[in-house]
């Protein structure tokens, strides 16, 4: 999860987030090299007295500044498209969970079970226990098995919301009348925090998401108690 004065993204917990971190570093290096080149050219222009005031045509220069940006865009687009298709791919999910956005809370339904659903509200600051996080704790966590492919169906009952968990690389819009889907897989157990990432009204900041990733045996015990 995030911590105060953090530089960079949250630690990756899913394969998709690991790919996104690699792509971020790849793109950042390209941007750094372009910025360095531009600053170098600007410094040369400011420090040298050599000018070409009579130059009317420079085919070589025009060729270079047309081909070079095209190559740079290809180097960014190819890995980006690869990750995009990976995020859209859904292969035999082990569990399906439907989440609905409301003003201003989330509701969850485990569709593989007959009667396993609940609402998830933020815990007010005055009710927090020692060690709990302000504006991030909920009364009902989403318990899911780790190391398994989970399909999330996301929609909304009222206005636009967005279901996002940064450490898993997830951000899916919740749109009224439309059912979006995404997949997640956590490689290690733990608590993973997220929030609504679409401005949805006065209490937009009070719609936290808490995923509790646990071993399969623990999840089976929990689901048996909840049904």
Curated annotation (Swiss-Prot):
Membrane topology: Multi-pass membrane protein
Main location class: mitochondrion
Alphabetical keyword list: Copper, Electron transport, Magnesium, Membrane, Metal-binding, Mitochondrion, Mitochondrion inner membrane, Phosphoprotein, Respiratory chain, Translocase, Transmembrane, Transmembrane helix, Transport
Keyword Transmembrane helix: yes
Pfam families recorded: COX2, COX2_TM
Enzymatic reactions: 4 Fe(II)-[cytochrome c] + O2 + 8 H(+)(in) = 4 Fe(III)-[cytochrome c] + 2 H2O + 4 H(+)(out)
CDD domains in the cross-refs: CcO_II_C (cd13912)
Keyword Mitochondrion: yes
Cofactor: Cu cation
Enzyme Commission identifier(s): 7.1.1.9
Residue positions binding Mg(2+): 198
Molecular function GO labels: copper ion binding; cytochrome-c oxidase activity
Record topological domains on the Mitochondrial intermembrane side: 1-14, 88-227
Modified residues (Phosphotyrosine): 218
Mitochondrial matrix topological segments: 46-59
Membrane-crossing residue ranges in chain numbering: 15-45, 60-87
Cofactor note as given: Binds a dinuclear copper A center per subunit.
Record InterPro entries: CcO_II, CcO_II-like_C, CcO_II_C, Copper_CuA, Cupredoxin, Cyt_c_oxidase_su2, Cyt_c_oxidase_su2_TM_dom, Cyt_c_oxidase_su2_TM_sf
Chain positions recorded as Cu cation A2 binding sites: 196, 198, 200, 204
Assembly notes: Component of the cytochrome c oxidase (complex IV, CIV), a multisubunit enzyme composed of 14 subunits. The complex is composed of a catalytic core of 3 subunits MT-CO1, MT-CO2 and MT-CO3, encoded in the mitochondrial DNA, and 11 supernumerary subunits COX4I, COX5A, COX5B, COX6A, COX6B, COX6C, COX7A, COX7B, COX7C, COX8 and NDUFA4, which are encoded in the nuclear genome.
Function per UniProt: Component of the cytochrome c oxidase, the last enzyme in the mitochondrial electron transport chain which drives oxidative phosphorylation. The respiratory chain contains 3 multisubunit complexes succinate dehydrogenase (complex II, CII), ubiquinol-cytochrome c oxidoreductase (cytochrome b-c1 complex, complex III, CIII) and cytochrome c oxidase (complex IV, CIV), that cooperate to transfer electrons derived from NADH and succinate to molecular oxygen, creating an electrochemical gradient over the inner membrane that drives transmembrane transport and the ATP synthase.
Family designation: Belongs to the cytochrome c oxidase subunit 2 family.
NCBIfam families: CoxB (TIGR02866)
Alphabetical list of PANTHER family matching this protein: CYTOCHROME C OXIDASE SUBUNIT 2, CYTOCHROME C OXIDASE, SUBUNIT II
UniProt name for this protein: Cytochrome c oxidase subunit 2
Gene that specifies this protein: MT-CO2
